[in-house]
Amino acid sequence: AKIAFFKSKNFSARDVAKLYVEEASIYRFTNNINSEKNLLYQALRTLLPLEKNSGLPKKNSLYPENTFLMIFDALAEIETNAERKIDYYDLSFYVSDLIKDNLVSQESLIIQQFEDRKRTEQCLKIFWLNYQKTKNNFWIDKAFLYAERSKNVILKEQSNLKTLAELHPNNKDLQLQKQLISEQETLINQLIRLQITGENPNEIENINSKLATITIELKIYNEKIQKQFKTEIEKELSISDLYAKIKIDKTQLVYFFWGNQSVYQFQISDNKMVWNQINLEAKFTENLKKFIHFFDDASLINNNIQLFTKTSFELFEALQFSILEKSKNTIIIPDGLLNFVAFDALVTQKTTSKKYSEIPFLVHQNKLAYQTNATFYIKNTPKEKQNTIVGFFPIFENTNAELLYSKEEAKALLPFKALLFMNEKATKANFLKNSSQYSILHLSTHGTSGSFSEPATLVFYDDLMLLNELYALQNCHPQLVVLSACETGIGKLQKGEGAMSIARAFQYAGAENILFSLWKINDYASAQLMTNFYEDYAKSNSFFEANYNSKIAYLENSDIANAKKSPYYWSAFVYYGAVDSAENNYLYYLFFGGIAIIILFLIYGRTSRLFKSKKI
């Protein structure tokens, strides 16, 4: 076959390199490592004919080519030297980044990211072994940075573009890129709708043609923006900045990386990082899934409270939460199946109590907030609240989908002079018209988590809203989105990117903080919790504190029956956002105010010297 291939004369360097890689894989099966390695380097020289160095190629000689990934990954797998193994993986990461620069759809980026996650896990294995041997914190820091680099690449890219647009509001390339991304998501939404309904098949071809044109245009603008803002875009997370943020927030952070064989956990507090490994053994995964499935139906916990508390405590122990500092704000950055865990409902001690208000839930020990990645945690600082609220309450009266207690929930917004769209006025058009004009968006409606073939949806009075329509939102940067709807935090789980949920779609669009549910919550409990939330927010002016206190108030409410105090009812809502308590707000204003004064002082000094020099 090889002789016939070369006789054909109709081949490229890429074809030859791939042939060498395939031949090398045959030697893998016969355990002939030297022959495999020689063929892989032969493939490398074929792709880099001008590279004279016989060792590792220089990064600036590489280009976006999938065959490089096959070569470097294979070399890493057969390499026995740990340091050189990492060097090969780093070259794969570099080429993967070059490839991602040319990708313009979320779907293609997710596929590319999937392979990066596998490489990251291999690197973490090496760092873990080195840490076990040396106990040198250098390996913890390195592992954390690699884990963070693999998290939410698409969301981070969107966040970077938003920041660039704020810093360079008149840049035409950024404006056109933003418009093209919005048009792309709008077309994808139209395509998905047509595929679901089976209507107008001819229009599908037309949309695909438009998408192909946009793809070409986006590649051009992406390249322009990469060249213009390369130094501003490529900034790696600083661990010292992370420690500084944790100190200001007076918090501790629990960070997870979910791999194929292990879950790696980083507990960070007071300039100290502890690294743990949790093996994905059957006992751990079964217990985790059992805990998650307790929230599938309201009756499951109530029917067997003791089994639930036992399962919950075992998970608490398995996640090594027992070493958390008590009575301290805690940020959780979940991953994998942990995205679907209501950590508030973990039980911190063995108990036989069947009275929910007496069960030692984690919510009584620590105030929790969540984030998707450490970069977002650092960037998400408390801002002065605008407190302009718009609410959407379709209610769906006299239908099987009626939300009976949604009216009570709406009353909680009245003291804020909120604009409320009730019943038939809670339309998709009114949402699109108003979503960019208010600092808090409140949606009390139905939501779906989607399926393998269909995306998650948000239900308005007159129509469904699919994920891609939310991705396409422009100038939608609310300080808070409240999703008082079923399953708004659930969606198809993608490695590294998390659940493709309604909540993530709002993050993608630009929401700063989000409060959403993890399962089909009872609308009475939802109304009660939201009432508690806004009553507390009116006093505390803190999303973080209001979310915590709404749950405590619910558990302490003597008018609510014990069965309704099951964590199924009160722990569904999770808050992804800043720790914006009053004390922290003061510290941030003091910190940034101090920086502003220093800048003004420097400008004044420079101006004074300039005037003096002119007088002379």
Residue map of PLM features:
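Alpha-helical solenoid repeat scaffolds used for protein-protein interaction
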Residues: 2-302, 329-342, 504-507, 527, ...
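Short helix/loop capping segments that flank catalytic or ligand/cofactor-binding pockets
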Residues: 158, 264-266, 275-276, 340-343, ...
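Catalytic cores of nucleophile-dependent amide-cleaving enzymes
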Residues: 372, 439-528, 532, 600-601
